[in-house]
Swiss-Prot record:
Quaternary structure (record): Monomer.
Domain of life: Bacteria
Pfam families linked: Zn_Ribbon_Topo
Catalytic activity: ATP-independent breakage of single-stranded DNA, followed by passage and rejoining
EC number: 5.6.2.1
Keyword hit for DNA-binding: yes
Name used for this protein in its record: DNA topoisomerase 1
Gene that produces this protein: topA
Free-text function comment from the UniProt entry: Releases the supercoiling and torsional tension of DNA, which is introduced during the DNA replication and transcription, by transiently cleaving and rejoining one strand of the DNA duplex. Introduces a single-strand break via transesterification at a target site in duplex DNA. The scissile phosphodiester is attacked by the catalytic tyrosine of the enzyme, resulting in the formation of a DNA-(5'-phosphotyrosyl)-enzyme intermediate and the expulsion of a 3'-OH DNA strand. The free DNA strand then undergoes passage around the unbroken strand, thus removing DNA supercoils.
UniProt keyword list: DNA-binding, Isomerase, Topoisomerase
GO biological process: DNA topological change
Disulphide-bridged cysteine pairs: none
Chain coiled-coil ranges: none
Transmembrane segments: none
Amino acid sequence: ATGWSAFFIDGKWTEAKK
């Protein structure tokens, strides 16, 4: 989605504001 990214890293769900 525009303005943010959500991704699964090392077994953890991470939300990175961009």
